């Protein structure tokens, strides 16, 4: 950010699993910004230390100024709206962020796969519903940027993502 003279406006979370939020306390200290998480995942973020211990990770401190949002929240970045799409299943408060023709999908939708549902609060039925009835209703040309691995498009995933793909 310093290199480009950019200023951070938000610290937004697609969900509150430790592998996505471990550096947020430091980011918050550097920027003074609150951390935003869906209201259904706030407890996960507040209990970051317990999550990290479960996975054998060392010290993990949760951020202090945590703000919640719901599916009706819209963030702005310049003249662009960032829309929240609540996609429970990986966690109860999993969300995707849609802005323009880009979707930040966190751990809900991956290239050829979906997020795990075997952690506490996960639900295969919910993630399936989120993908089929929310994400797959979006324009097929939207580029999906998952929380891990390669980007994809809504159209590609509708066609090929097992068990949802038309070609399976």
Sequence positions of predicted segments:
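Active-site HxH/HxHxD metal-binding segment of metal-dependent hydrolases
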Residues: 2-76, 159-163
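Metallo-beta-lactamase
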Residues: 6, 51-54, 81-168
């Amino acid at each position: 950010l310093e290199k480009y003279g950019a200023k951070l406006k938000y610290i937004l979370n697609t969900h509150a699993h430790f592998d996505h939020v471990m550096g947020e306390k430091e980011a918050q200290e550097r920027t003074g910004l609150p951390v935003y998480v869906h209201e259904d995942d706030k407890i996960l973020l507040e209990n970051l230390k317990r999550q990290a211990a479960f996975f054998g990770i060392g010290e993990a401190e949760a951020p202090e100024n945590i703000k919640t949002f719901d599916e009706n929240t819209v963030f702005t970045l310049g003249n662009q709206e960032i829309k929240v799409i609540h996609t429970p299943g990986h966690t109860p408060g999993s969300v995707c962020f849609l802005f323009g023709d880009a979707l930040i999908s966190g751990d809900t939708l991956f290239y050829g796969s979906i997020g795990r549902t075997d952690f506490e609060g996960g639900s295969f039925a919910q993630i399936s519903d989120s993908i089929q009835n929310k994400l797959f209703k979006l324009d097929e040309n939207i580029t999906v940027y998952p929380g891990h691995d390669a980007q994809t498009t809504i159209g590609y995933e509708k066609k090929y993502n097992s068990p949802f793909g038309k070609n399976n």
